[in-house]
């Protein structure tokens, strides 16, 4: 079994009914599409650097003997896992998969809201982590903006629904 067939299996699970739908080769290779994905990749790299840097802070605090709340460890692990997932979605979307584009666009709008709401809870996170969450959110909102341009919405137009067939009931 090769890697691509494993990835296609993952796509079928993650993509649902649109797992096999890809955009036209012309739109996929369009320079505008390419520029958007270059920008998104760099923004995700920045996310990864910030997330990794943020992970270094509690590690250093812990090594120094300070108590680090479990919620900080969990949030950092979740942020790094989400960023990894977003990289996968961006890669598959760049290869033309509609489902990956739609997931990337959706999550780049939802994750910032969740991050900002949790960062606003008094005393939940230390100040350095609240700052990291705000940066994380702003970068994701930038990704959402790139994905919402007219060109990208045209390139990744929602596939038409299959016509519903009436089920005949035997009486």
PLM features per residue range, with description:
Residues 1-171:
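Topology signature of small-to-medium multi-pass alpha-helical membrane proteins
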